[in-house]
Amino acid sequence: MQALLAPVVEALGYECWGIEFLSQGRHSLLRVYIDHADGILIDDCEKVSRQISGVLDVEDPISSEYTLEVSSPGMDRPLFTLEQFVRCAGEQVKIRLRSPFEGRRNFQGLLRGVEDQDVVVLVDDHEYLLPIDLIDKANIIPRFD
């Protein structure tokens, strides 16, 4: 899906921050996160949604019913790629793993960066190197200071 939709988003002048496909029984949700240095407004989401809808209608990559949602990543932005983990180093993060690592699946702490294919997180004075392929979900924890 990334290979199909990212070029559409980028051709409009936005960054394709990430794509989620959430299966919810017979109806699913395709969520496309877009970003821009000047921020994202509802008009930006509408413009990108129209273009993506056209591509999806032609290519028809999803056989079931779904809803398309185009959104800003927001303050609690999800992290999808190693590059995003590098860009967000120094932020507080919440990470959920697909399976336990060192006896736990949930980590909340300071994102230190990336080493090879591992995301480095400091939790309670202990540094964890979490393999990127084990990460199910990761989000920035917004600061309000």
Curated annotation (Swiss-Prot):
Report the main location listed first in the record: cytoplasm
Query: Could you tell me where this protein is found in the cell?
Result: Cytoplasm
**Record's GO cellular component terms:** cytosol
Name the domain of life this protein comes from.
Answer: Bacteria
Q: Matching NCBIfam families, A to Z? A: PRK00092.1-1 (NF000927)
What family does the Swiss-Prot or TrEMBL record give for this protein? Belongs to the RimP family.
HAMAP family, A to Z: RimP (MF_01077)
Its annotated function is as follows: Required for maturation of 30S ribosomal subunits.
Protein name in UniProt: Ribosome maturation factor RimP
Name the source organism. Answer: Azotobacter vinelandii (strain DJ / ATCC BAA-1303)
Organism taxonomic ancestry: Bacteria, Pseudomonadati, Pseudomonadota, Gammaproteobacteria, Pseudomonadales
